[in-house]
Regions:
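Core subunits and conserved enzymes of cellular information-processing
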Residues: 2-212
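Short amphipathic alpha-helix segments
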Residues: 209-222
Length: 222
């Protein structure tokens, strides 16, 4: 039974479903709440929204795809092929969701909108993180920096979002930035909750001369 569960969790259909459902929910949060209210989310999606508000030249989904191209070119060389493949699919789903979903959730109060948007984005992110891939953007950069320079993933996310929201105060009204911060806080809490629902995915870095033997032993006990 343990082996079958392990194979199911690491199988392609299971991860495709997670990335698809998570990307759709995330896209609904961005297109149905954040974009109509002028909010920005954290991470690369927030950067794309900020650039869109600033320039209005390209839709956020197209910007997200363009910014991900050089990242995935680097990722092809430095991250695992499995993570790369799933992340490429996740990025495509999120790009299409942001651009093609034609939905505006009828929430007029900005604080309620920040709450609903945070719940949707956090839920979508949590489902994506349960897969063996990502939605591209910050996730791929964080893995690259962690592998090449030993920079902690959480540290990179924190510094990126600090810079993003600090710059937002220059380009957007203060009220919108504060509501965006509230939405990001809600999304982070929902993300943690979704991850803890079935927290079976752990990551550990093992440095040893017998890495192959250790890996085989771990897999045999799962």
């Amino acid at each position: 039974m343990k082996i079958s569960v392990h194979n199911y969790a690491y199988g392609i259909p299971y991860n495709i479903i997670l990335l698809t459902v998570g990307g759709l929910i995330f896209g609904i949060g961005v297109k149905g709440i954040a974009l109509p209210h002028g909010f920005i989310s954290g991470g690369f999606s927030g950067l794309c929204l900020l650039v869109y508000y600033w320039t209005g030249l390209l839709p956020p989904g197209v910007l997200y795809f363009i910014l991900n191209v050089p990242i995935f070119l680097l990722g092809w060389r430095y991250v695992s092929r499995r993570f790369f493949g799933y992340s490429l699919y996740g990025m495509a789903i999120l790009t299409l969701s942001i651009d093609l979903i034609d939905l505006q959730i009828a929430v007029k109060d900005p604080m309620l909108a920040a709450l609903v948007g945070g719940c949707l984005i956090g839920c979508g992110s949590g489902i994506i993180f349960h897969s063996l891939g990502s939605a591209g953007g910050n996730d791929v950069i964080a893995v690259l920096l962690n592998q090449r320079f030993n920079i902690r993933i959480g540290t990179f996310f924190f510094l990126f979002n600090i810079g993003l929201f600090a710059f937002s105060f220059v380009r957007l009204p203060v009220d919108l930035v504060l509501f965006s911060l509230a939405m990001s806080f809600v999304s982070s809490q929902v993300l943690e909750y979704v991850l803890n629902i079935s927290n079976q995915r752990k990551m550990a870095l093992i440095v040893s001369e017998h890495s192959n033997r250790i890996a085989q032993e771990i897999l045999s006990r799962l």
